[in-house]
Each structure stands twice: as structure tokens, then as C-alpha cells.
Amino acid sequence: MAKVSIYLNFPGNAEEAFNHYKSVFKTEFAMPVMRMKDAPPRPGMPPMSEKDANAVMHASLPILGGTLIMASDMLESMGHKTVVGNNTTISLEPDTREETDRLFRALSEGGSEIAPMSDEFWGYWGCCLDRFGIRWMFNFPKEMN
């Protein structure tokens, strides 16, 4: 079944924020928190500091009515700067890869591709900015692929 989630980016304090949200909503993480060090190494990628390696790559927490909030740390040391505008993203998980591509193309039109759709270790993923300045993330998980 297709899903919509809210994706939040933090400048290095995602875990602190999500532990707070966990206590507010009285829920548990939907899956174990993934760390930057959990990602397979990419060719040419420099080694990470211990602090960066332990930063949050992905966390997800159910809040109300089955809605998930998800998050990651966008670290300046990795070329990111978290500012109002790139700290919140609408995350779509369509039912098919074809629908994922269709939505990505339609929402990118007149806007820009932040990360083109590509096969990643967790699934088929991409991100765009629509012509109104809204960030959209697309994920078609590997188990559905």
C-alpha cells in the first residue's frame, strides 16, 4: 500500500530530537536507527570521523494514525547545510516502480532534481525540488522491487 511520510533533516541532533518525539508520542522506533557507518562504502569516499560515522542516516518513528516521521542528520562535513527549506521533505512510497518514476518526473518538471532516481542498497530512491520550492523524496523499497 502506498504511503506518505514526513522526512526531517537535522544538523547533527536527529537522535536527540527523535528521542524527544519518542517520549512525546509514547511510541518506539519503527526499525533500528541506521547510522552513517551502516552504509556500504562508496568508491572515492573519504573516511568518516567517529562522530560522523555515528550520526543518524535514517530513523523512523510512528506518531499518530500510522503516520511516520523520519529523519537523518545532514552534516556540514559531508557537504550539507541544514536551513529552513531543506529541513522538511514530503516522502512518498508509491506502490510500483513505474508510479515512482511518473511522480518523480511530474514533480521535477519546472523544478530541479536534487538526486536522480537510482538503485541504492535499500531500494530505488530519488529527491527533487518542485517548481514551488517543496522538497519531495521518493522511495521504492528493495523488498517491493
What are these regions, as identified by a protein language model?
Residues 8-66:
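Core segments of cupin and vicinal oxygen chelate
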